[in-house]
């Protein structure tokens, strides 16, 4: 139950298992039409109880049934059975890891409800938490945890159209209400409705329901932080393009060698020129047999689908949104005017003395009051059952474009891998030709040296010895006294050997200075100039061969990724198209139902007022 201290509707929970309603009676969620316009009433819902003992009382009222959608992992026969409501409870082979998993597996149509929204007692009342009820199990999650769940699902299933969640607070919200923007009751009620829709849409997706992450979000015994830091979420590569599309948490060795295209990369060759709206409309929405078409042929269908989605998004976020907002504002203004008009008629009736006239005027005032209430309900009903789903459809358009963009990036990645592999093969061929040419030249030079050995000059020592002998023979012709001049003078013995050692010292000093100045330059030049081109060429050949082996693995992985991504995206787009058509049908019916109910209420009250006014003439 709520702590109503200070009249705070967001008071903290007094106990964790509390299910008392905290909904503001004036909010849209407290009205029957907000659920009826989208889903049946809770009394109309029946589902099989889980096969495990129930922890809650038998007086729990199950939640509303959401529209049934065919599972994208089911066969054609299973899809037909689901469409006719013939889905029967089933058992999972191998057992269950959690009670919530058993409930969802055996009762795939079990609705998920968000019953409450309020400040969390554990966080000191700083955060708004949403109470999620699945059968008889409840768990509380913050909006940021919903956002992290959706982010994890988009990384785990990049080829699936994961439903959107309500947007975060905008800067305009904080500017308009800087202190209580996060506690705005209308925004909280909106999030309650749309987050429940998000969870139930995920429930109808077979891959999401069985990936081991989504149902842990609903498990009260699971720590969401631990789930995000454990397999499979933690095993997904940081760069999603280096992971397989159907199982990103288990990439192969070849995926680590894949190049990563930029987010704005485009295909080199498009199948046709950019399709406009008319050309996209003339093309069939989906290919008749995707298995017999190449990736280039499938590109045209994906481009046509993306064009139609862009047109839908521009329509929903442009004229439709403006007209919707203007209509709701007019209805709110009309309701205020009717409220004031009813008050004026009631005051006027008190001043009238004639009983019949006074009663007639009072009845007109009551009719105006009734019209005020009906118009206010109509405005809120259209906002909840029509305007909000239209905004969600616009968000879906952005999600679809991201999924199609992922497939395009996979195609670009395949082209980049093929181009890089061709470049490496051409480089290897060039290096091998250079190596063969160098070996041929070495072999030719070796054979030439064996046939005509070059003439060898006498060694330098031999020449010096010969010159010494000649000098000795010349000196022998002179008297010995002439040899005294060849000796050093006597002054050389006593004098320091400064003159003899000075040139060598100067030369060494100049050499060290030169090394300091030109050493780094010489080192840099040696780094640029290949001192051993043959060894460098052999090393380059080895590295190139290794790169080719890696790129061949990457090419195999990329080809499989593109094929799997195209098949999975096409399959999920078909599911999304069926769901979108059903949603639009439901939105239009909800719009018509709201208008009919509003008109019936007004007709009934004003006919009663007319009958009361006619009594004046009779009297």
UniProtKB/Swiss-Prot annotation:
Alphabetical list of InterPro entries matching this protein: AH/BAR_dom_sf (IPR027267), PX_dom (IPR001683), PX_dom_sf (IPR036871), PX_Snx41/Atg20 (IPR044106), Sorting_Nexin_Autophagy (IPR051079), Vps5_C (IPR015404)
- PROSITE patterns assigned: PX (PS50195)
Q: What does this protein do?
A: May be required for cytoplasm to vacuole transport (Cvt) and pexophagy.
Q: What is known of its domains?
A: The PX domain binds phosphatidylinositol 3-phosphate which is necessary for peripheral membrane localization to the perivacuolar punctate structures.
Q: Which GO terms describe its biological process?
A: autophagy of mitochondrion; protein transport; reticulophagy; retrograde transport, endosome to Golgi
Source organism: Neurospora crassa (strain ATCC 24698 / 74-OR23-1A / CBS 708.71 / DSM 1257 / FGSC 987)
Recall the GO molecular function terms of this protein's record: phosphatidylinositol-3-phosphate binding
Residues that bind a 1,2-diacyl-sn-glycero-3-phospho-(1D-myo-inositol-3-phosphate): 142, 144, 168, 191
Q: Please note every region of biased composition (Basic and acidic residues).
A: 454-467
Membrane topology, from the record: Peripheral membrane protein
Q: According to its record, what are the GO cellular component terms?
A: cytosol; endosome membrane; phagophore assembly site
Instruction: Supply the SUPFAM superfamilies for this chain.
Output: PX domain (SSF64268)
Q: Show where the PX domain sits.
A: 108-224
What's the protein called, per UniProt? Answer: Sorting nexin-41
Q: Where in the cell is it found?
A: Endosome membrane; Endomembrane system
* Superkingdom assignment: Eukaryota
């Amino acid at each position: 139950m709520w702590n109503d201290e200070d009249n705070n509707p967001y008071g903290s929970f007094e106990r964790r298992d509390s299910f008392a309603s905290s909904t503001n009676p004036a909010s849209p969620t407290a009205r029957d039409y907000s659920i009826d316009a989208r889903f049946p009433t809770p009394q109309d819902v029946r589902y099989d109880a889980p096969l495990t003992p129930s922890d809650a009382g038998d007086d729990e009222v199950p939640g509303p049934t959401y529209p049934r959608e065919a599972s994208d992992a089911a066969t054609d026969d299973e899809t037909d059975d689901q469409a006719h409501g013939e889905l029967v409870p089933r058992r999972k082979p191998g057992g269950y890891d959690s009670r919530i998993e058993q409930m969802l597996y055996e009762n795939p149509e079990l609705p998920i409800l968000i019953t409450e929204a309020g400040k969390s007692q554990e966080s000191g009342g700083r955060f708004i938490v949403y109470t999620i009820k699945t059968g008889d199990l409840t768990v509380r999650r913050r909006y940021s945890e919903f956002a992290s769940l959706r982010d994890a699902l988009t990384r785990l299933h990049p080829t699936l159209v994961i439903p959107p969640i309500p947007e975060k607070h905008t800067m305009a919200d904080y500017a308009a209400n800087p202190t209580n923007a996060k506690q705005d009751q209308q925004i909280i009620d909106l999030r309650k409705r749309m987050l429940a829709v998000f969870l139930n849409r995920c429930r109808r997706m077979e891959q999401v329901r069985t990936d081991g992450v989504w149902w842990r979000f609903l498990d009260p015994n699971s720590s969401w932080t631990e789930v995000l830091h454990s397999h499979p979420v933690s095993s997904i590569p940081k760069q999603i393009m280096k992971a397989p599309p159907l199982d990103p948490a288990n990439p192969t060795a070849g995926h680590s060698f894949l190049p990563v295209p930029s987010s704005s990369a485009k295909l080199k060759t498009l199948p046709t020129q950019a399709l406009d709206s008319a050309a996209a409309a003339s093309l069939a929405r989906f290919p008749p047999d995707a298995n017999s078409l190449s990736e280039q042929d499938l590109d045209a269908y994906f481009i046509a689908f993306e064009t139609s989605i862009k047109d839908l998004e521009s329509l929903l976020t442009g004229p439709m949104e403006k007209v919707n907002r203007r209509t709701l504002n007019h209805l709110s203004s009309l309701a205020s005017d009717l409220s004031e008009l009813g008050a004026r008629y009631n005051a006027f009736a008190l001043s009238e003395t004639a009983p019949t006239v006074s009663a007639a005027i009072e009845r007109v005032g009551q009719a105006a009051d009734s019209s005020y209430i009906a118009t206010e309900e109509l405005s809120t009903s259209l906002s909840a059952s029509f305007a909000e789903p239209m905004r969600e459809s616009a968000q879906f358009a952005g999600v679809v474009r991201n999924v199609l963009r992922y497939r395009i990036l996979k195609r670009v990645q395949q082209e980049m891998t093929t181009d890089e592999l061709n470049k490496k093969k051409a480089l290897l061929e060039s290096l091998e030709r250079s190596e063969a040419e160098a070996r041929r030249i070495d072999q030719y030079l070796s054979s030439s040296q064996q046939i005509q050995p070059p003439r060898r000059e006498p060694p330098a020592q031999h020449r010096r010895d010969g010159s010494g002998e000649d000098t000795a023979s010349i000196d022998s012709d002179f008297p010995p006294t002439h040899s005294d001049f060849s000796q050093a003078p006597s002054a050389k013995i006593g004098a320091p050997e400064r003159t003899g050692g000075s040139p060598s010292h100067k030369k060494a000093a100049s050499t060290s200075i030169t090394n300091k100045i030109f050493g780094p330059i010489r080192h840099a030049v040696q780094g640029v100039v290949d001192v051993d081109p043959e060894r460098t060429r052999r090393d380059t050949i080895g590295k190139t061969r290794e790169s080719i082996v890696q790129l061949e693995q990457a090419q195999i992985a990329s080809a499989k990724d593109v094929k799997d991504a195209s098949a999975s995206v096409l399959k999920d787009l078909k599911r999304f198209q069926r769901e979108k058509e059903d949603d639009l049908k439901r939105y239009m019916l909800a719009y018509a139902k709201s208008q009919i109910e509003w008109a019936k209420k007004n007709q009934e009250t004003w006919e009663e007022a007319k009958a009361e006014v006619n009594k004046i003439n009779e009297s």
